[in-house]
Amino acid sequence: MSDAPKRSLNPTLMMNNNNTPPKPLEESLDLKEFIALFKTFFAKERDTIALENDLKQTFTYLNEVDAIGLPTPKSVKESDLIIIKLTKLGTLHLDEIFEIVKRLHYIVVLQNAFKTFTHLKFHERLNAIVLPPFFNDLIALFDDEGKIKQGANATLDALNESLNRLKKESVKIIHHYARSKELAPYLVDTQSHLKHGYECLLLKSGFSGAIKGVVLERSANGYFYLLPESAQKIAQKIAQIGNEIDCCIVEMCQTLSHSLQKHLLFLKFLFKEFDFLDSLQARLNFAKAYNLEFVMPSFTQKKMILENFSHPILKEPKPLNLKFEKSMLAVTGVNAGGKTMLLKSLLSAAFLSKHLIPMKINAHHSIIPYFKEIHAIINDPQNSANNISTFAGRMKQFSALLSKENMLLGVDEIELGTDADEASSLYKTLLEKLLKQNNQIIITTHHKRLSVLMAENKEVELLAALYDEEKERPTYTFLKGVIGKSYAFETALRYGVPHFLIEKAKTFYGEDKEKLNVLIENSSALERELKQKNEHLENALKEQEYLKNAWLLEMEKQKEIFHNKKLELEKSYQQALNILKSEVASKDTSSMHKEIHKASEILSKHKTNQEIPQIITNFQANEKARYKNESVLIVQILDKGYYWIETELGMRLKAHGSLLKKIQKPPKNKFKPPKTTIPKPKEASLRLDLRGQRSEEALDLLDAFLNDALLGGFEEVLICHGKGSGILEKFVKEFLKNHPKVVSFSDAPINLGGSGVKIVKL
């Protein structure tokens, strides 16, 4: 088997007659290397990548810890054997106890790191892990290398001290002989060699007269590894102390194992929590290392929208942008034009999203439904040993799926292995049955007849891979709503088939079928032209909508300015009136005159400095004139040199004749007013930070910010309210729901602030 997960979601459909295991789904979708790379981020080697916890809860945790980050734990081994030993009242080895300590230490590190983030749900999850006092003592017993710390056991400390002293003496003896003049003729080198746990010398033959000892081994060159007689006694003592140390450690392991047996249920809980935290940090660190994004699968929507998705197997991918809004997608078109990779990309996105594995995608604008099962019929199932042909294998795979519901099925080259006309009728029947069972299906095919038959179904979308006839190459782009041509002759020519053979093949192909291909090409070209026109019209409508919204905002702004000015004048008038009343009441004439003068000064501050020019031009009704930088129409002549005028946007206002100018040589034909450009605010920003503001202040800032954004022509803005107690978030949501110009809003992706930031579409 490959290193793919054993519990993948039914990757292929069944085993062969000889019980050969089917190819895993991730291998069929070319995700094997990507998944293998992802697995390297786990602390514990594992077969499965599936999440045992709730997806929504896990996604919430990922959003919360994204900005903070999660440390990487030390590599750990499988815990099943530890549980089995403790269940059977066995004794754990020191390294097995250290496996428990590594997990405990990581959880303590996380609890300390998130101690201040009490508002996070992830903090609640960590706080639910309460370590019994025994485990705190157990952590303190080991150093980072998995050895017993000095001071933890007095007997062990004394033995280690004796062992170190004896080893130093042994090394000293070896170094003494290595510098000895009597032994120099027999020394191969002056180094100390470690053999069978003993420090020894490497000597040439004939040394027996110069030194006594035990030969431990001979080298490949015929030399002798000798343990000197004087060092032999020390080596025996070292071995004896080593045995005593082992006995001491065994006693400690027995004591610790006995204590761990009392906490067996907690250990099972600990291992399960560590595995979850490990899967969490692996996903987060994998996403950060390769700049990937998470997509939470939708449990309510059936449509699939991918924006800027890139399949991991492609080195220089062309990002995929696709909306799959119906129950079935039939992909046709040019050979080697990307149909199979499109199929694999859609299935891969669903597979990665289901397991919350990050991918290269614009997560904010993408929607991926949750599928209970995902199946791929991509590879040729032919098996000569079991007497199974290509078509028979396909039928066997389909028969296993006919009872499935709520699955995503991908079938590559659906017509493979049999007569095209018969296959069209057969597959139409099979596909319609699967569609009735609430399944979603993606197929690639060159069957024009099958595509035409399926196109009659309202739940079927058509998609064609396009071909550039000028460059004679596929464009790796797709067009909705049409059946594509295969371009088999052009593809064969591109891959080296001689031109004269291609021409001969075309004569056999027949004039009628060539005409059918021409009709298909013309239909495709017409569809592309209509699509371009629709895009042009949509852009024009958006521009008009923007101008309309900008004008409405400008009107509201002018009304507000007028209202504020009115209040200011009323306040000034009341202030001057109060001064006069107070002086009249005091009956002080001289003071009264002074205060009247003072009141006049207050009122004079608010008089307009603008004087009406004396040069006035007369106009007639329905005459065109220029007001500031706009072309206007004279609607009505008023008294005292004033006129009612109408702007190009249909707005009527009163203006003095001095502000109007004659238009020289007006055009004889239809009046074409120039485009009006509403000035954008200089201080418009894409982001507003409301953290630390009171609700009333925040709503005022938010209202002004949205007005500036609309005038600035922004379609999306960011509003940061923080995560706190949620009161400010509630006010912001309520305001956005009731704002007439807000199309929609949602939480930002993890890298932009998560649930503490709203992305607002205007």
Swiss-Prot record:
EC nos: 3.1.-.-, 3.6.4.-
Domain Smr, residue spans: 688-762
One GO biological process term: rescue of stalled ribosome
PROSITE patterns the UniProt entry points to: SMR
SMART domains: MUTSac, MUTSd, SMR
Reported phenotype of the disruption mutant: Mutants have a significantly increased frequency of intergenomic recombination. They are more sensitive than wild-type cells to oxidative stress induced by agents such as H(2)O(2), paraquat or oxygen. They also have a reduced colonization capacity in a mouse model of infection.
InterPro entries hit by this protein: DNA_mismatch_repair_MutS_C, DNA_mismatch_repair_MutS_core, DNA_mismatch_repair_MutS_sf, MutS, MutS2, P-loop_NTPase, Smr_dom, Smr_dom_sf
Enzyme class: hydrolase
Highest taxon, organism lineage: Bacteria
Protein's name in the database: Endonuclease MutS2
The species this protein was found in: Helicobacter pylori (strain ATCC 700392 / 26695)
